[in-house]
């Protein structure tokens, strides 16, 4: 398709541009798309034919085109199709495999100390969101009216439906 042809051109360009960078340890196709397709209720949320198309298109891109292009352009560096590449919530039996995200503190409101127990081989995402430093906030908010979690400006900058509640929890 024209879309995949365009993606291939972008892949080649970016792989060649980035493959010599010392910080590129592995290539990753996406962040949490497979996780969402499998575990976030999308199979129930969308009609069966739409959900099946999601998977078909996912496979074509992340299990097909991207790794095929990487084999040609950067064959020695590993590729994972989605991050995390282990099961959600950092199950202990998965901790020695691949890389992991652990949302137990953020989404599950577990105490920070749980991170001493949930120690995967490679954790690429964990922790709790926060607001930016005050100098950054001052670029979009006025101190006299907007420096309140409930102000319209602060709500517009909070992208998580549970964000402010979790921040206040901790």
Language model segments and positions:
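Substrate-binding clefts and catalytic carboxylate motifs of secreted carbohydrate-active enzymes
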Residues: 27, 34, 61, 65-71, ...
């Amino acid at each position: 398709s024209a879309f995949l042809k365009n993606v291939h051109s972008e892949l080649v360009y970016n792989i060649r541009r980035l493959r010599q960078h010392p910080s590129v340890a592995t290539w990753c196709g996406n962040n949490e798309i497979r996780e969402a397709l499998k575990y976030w209720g999308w199979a129930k949320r969308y009609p069966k034919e739409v959900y099946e198309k999601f998977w078909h298109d996912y496979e074509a891109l992340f299990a097909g085109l991207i790794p095929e292009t990487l084999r040609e352009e950067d064959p020695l560096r590993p590729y994972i199709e989605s991050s995390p590449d282990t099961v959600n919530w950092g199950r202990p039996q998965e901790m020695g495999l691949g890389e992991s995200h652990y949302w137990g503190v953020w989404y599950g409101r577990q105490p920070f100390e749980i991170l001493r127990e949930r120690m995967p081989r490679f954790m690429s995402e964990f922790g709790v969101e926060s607001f930016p430093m005050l100098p950054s906030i001052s670029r979009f908010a006025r101190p006299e009216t907007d420096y309140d979690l409930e102000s319209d400006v602060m709500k517009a900058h909070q992208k998580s439906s549970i964000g402010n509640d979790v921040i206040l929890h901790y």
